[in-house]
Amino acid sequence: MPIVLWVVSSFSLRAQEKDFATWANAGFEYKLKPAFTVSGGLEWRTKDDLGKTDRWGLKVGGSYKLLPFLKLGAGYETHYRNRGADGWKFRHRYRLEGTLSARVQRVKLSLRERFQHTFDGHRDEFRLRSRAKFAYDIPKCKLEPYASAEMYNGLNKTEHFGVKRMRYRGGITLPLSERWEADIFYCRQWEKDKRKDIVGV
């Protein structure tokens, strides 16, 4: 309980700038072996209440199922971002992650820990992202609702592992075919001085 109160209070002491955005993603996963999967995707994000494109993104990655309950992964992303008066700029990111998962009857639980390093030639940003996710497999229904909470901790020298961002997300996944799946979601993102409401697919 004290931890929850600390996280909430850290984002509620100052007036926040608000924004509404959309995120659109299209990607694929392909199993090279039963335990090894490669993936890739394209991303488009908006900002300023849908008025401007925020960024385009390209990502590739792979994951390996080390144990029935443990998956390890790594990946690379590049972002082409709208920096306003500074124009459009590239930045790059690599990530390393591990995911623990379990199933209790129809309830699916997972905990993912992700280290990421983001850089643009001028600034390096190091983050540890911790995400807890809950999903429910509805009997005789293809829809699968889920909810997750994710915390970003700063790893740069002066950040002292402080909470830099929180994301609360709820959505529904729907298989469209044997190889395609849709994910429709709403996400509330909190930072120290801004809040963002996001609808995505």
List the model feature ranges, each with a label.
Residues 1-20:
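Bacterial Sec-dependent N-terminal signal peptides
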Residues 16-65, 71:
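Start-of-domain marker
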Residues 16-23, 46-55, 83-89, 119-126, ...:
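Solvent-exposed loop/turn segments connecting transmembrane beta-strands
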Residues 27, 61, 97-99, 131-135, ...:
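Outer-membrane beta-barrel architecture
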Residues 30, 64, 100-102, 136-138, ...:
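Residue-level signature of outer-membrane beta-barrel architecture
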Residues 35-40, 69-74, 105-109, 140-144, ...:
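Repeated loop/turn-to-beta-strand initiation elements of outer-membrane beta-barrel proteins
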Residues 42-48, 76-82, 102-106, 115-119, ...:
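Transmembrane beta-strands of outer-membrane beta-barrel pores
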Residues 98, 197-201:
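Outer-membrane beta-barrel "beta-signal"
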